[in-house]
């Protein structure tokens, strides 16, 4: 994530001079280039381009020191959890640059939720009071152009009230909030990277949102005891207008979301494909799914009017359930079986694979996107044929990041580790190569220390 010049330690400690003038907000934004930091899925990063990210002094501590007036090497946007905020932090200094007010209001310091402008963004009741005062941000993701972040917009979720918020990159302020209809526990969020059909649209125009909790549809209390009526909605939000374009109802629950670099596919890892109402039922199956959405087909169905509408909402809803999508050549969705109650799904930077982490299984499933498209063309009968690797990497896999050199880094919440493993080696091992070295290293901080355990 840094170049050779950024790794060098200078012979002398630089002093604040004309070369390192205090940086204004406009200069900060003007000297920031975009970089995707696909870590735990909680942050989106900006890379500062001033002075090659020079380090401040000798040693490990010196390399993390950023003197007043200097830029950090990277800037990240983090979710703030129950604070309802998005936070901008510098790396490696760790300085908190700004707290962007989003969902929690009113805030006396910033005026968020007090001014007329912010009230209009947040939404109010007929009496003028705020509709909601709290929120729970989990994930922040930025808009794309030419396959990388362009810094125009950033989006975050509200898991409490099913809302999506947009932050304008040039202002670092929230400018729009949309409530997703018939959605509870909105968790997974990811923008598309280009249009699935028009090659000229090589930038983000959609944001995909996965509902974690299935609910009876319609959710009016009339069918709460009927398990078959419980479904979850996958929503597509227009990146510019922030209006909900369409929704796709599916079986089971959804967690996190990923989108392909060619714009053709979006996916969400799923748990509770059993459609159970109690924990024992939700965790009975050894495999759940990573459900893929064929964006072009869904939007053709919407345009053709092959939709329904849920009472109380004007958003068109297509049927993505298994029962309605048995023929791959006409299917809107593809349910790829993966173990067990998976938590995260992440796209490899080469655009070839989605990695679906097992959470209740010690595995990470590598799904070949070309094979998924082949399934939609009727070339594979079993969606499981799209899986090309499933290495055992440790207990409680959650999120996966990549280094651009063929290696994946997956967090393990039970083992309290980050494990480094090689994707190509995992594919070879899946084919029967017993000499393939899949797991390369582990970082263990289970007892407060950090240790490397190279295999």
Describe each region flagged by the PLM.
Residues 1-27, 34-40:
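N-terminal secretory signal peptides
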Residues 32, 41, 50-455:
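Predominantly soluble domains enriched in secretory-pathway, periplasmic, or organellar proteins
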């Amino acid at each position: 994530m840094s170049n050779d010049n950024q790794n060098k330690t200078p012979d002398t400690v630089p002093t604040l001079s004309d070369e390192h003038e205090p940086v204004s907000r406009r200069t900060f934004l003007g000297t920031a280039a975009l970089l995707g930091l696909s870590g735990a899925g909680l942050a989106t990063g900006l890379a500062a381009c001033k002075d090659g990210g020079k380090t401040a002094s000798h040693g490990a501590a010196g390399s993390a020191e950023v003197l007043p007036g200097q830029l950090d090497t990277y800037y990240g946007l983090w979710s703030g959890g129950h604070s309802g905020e998005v936070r901008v932090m510098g790396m490696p200094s760790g300085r908190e640059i700004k707290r962007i007010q989003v969902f929690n209001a009113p805030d006396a310091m910033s005026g968020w939720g007090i001014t007329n402008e912010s009230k209009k963004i947040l939404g109010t009741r007929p009496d003028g009071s705020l509709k909601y005062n709290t929120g729970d941000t989990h994930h922040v993701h930025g808009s794309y152009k030419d396959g990388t972040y362009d810094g125009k917009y950033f989006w975050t979720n509200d898991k409490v009230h099913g809302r999506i918020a947009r932050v304008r990159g040039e202002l670092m302020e929230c400018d729009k909030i949309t409530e997703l209809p018939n959605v509870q526990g909105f968790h997974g969020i990811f923008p598309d990277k280009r249009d699935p059909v028009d090659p000229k649209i090589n930038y983000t125009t959609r944001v995909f949102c996965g509902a974690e909790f299935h609910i009876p549809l319609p959710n009016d209390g009339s069918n709460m005891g009927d398990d078959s009526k419980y479904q979850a909605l996958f929503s597509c939000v227009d990146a510019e207008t922030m209006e909900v374009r369409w929704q796709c109802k599916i079986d089971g629950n959804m967690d996190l979301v990923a989108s392909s670099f060619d714009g053709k596919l979006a996916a969400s890892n799923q748990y509770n494909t059993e459609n159970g109402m109690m924990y024992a039922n939700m965790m009975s199956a050894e495999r759940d799914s990573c459900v893929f959405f064929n964006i072009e087909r869904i939007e053709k169905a919407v345009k053709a009017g092959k939709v329904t509408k849920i009472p109380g909402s004007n958003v068109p809803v297509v049927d993505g359930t298994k029962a309605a999508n048995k023929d791959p050549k006409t299917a809107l969705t593809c349910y790829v079986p993966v173990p067990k109650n998976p938590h995260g799904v992440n796209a490899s930077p080469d655009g070839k694979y989605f990695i679906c982490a097992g959470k209740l299984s010690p595995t990470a499933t590598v799904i070949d996107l070309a094979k998924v498209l082949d399934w939609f063309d009727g070339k594979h009968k079993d969606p499981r044929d799209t899986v090309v690797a499933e290495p055992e990497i440790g207990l409680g896999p959650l999120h996966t990041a990549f280094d651009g050199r063929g290696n994946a880094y997956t967090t393990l919440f039970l083992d309290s580790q980050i494990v480094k493993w090689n994707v190509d080696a995992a594919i070879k091992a899946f084919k029967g190569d017993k000499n393939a070295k899949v797991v390369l290293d582990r970082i263990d901080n289970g007892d407060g220390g950090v240790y490397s355990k190279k295999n």
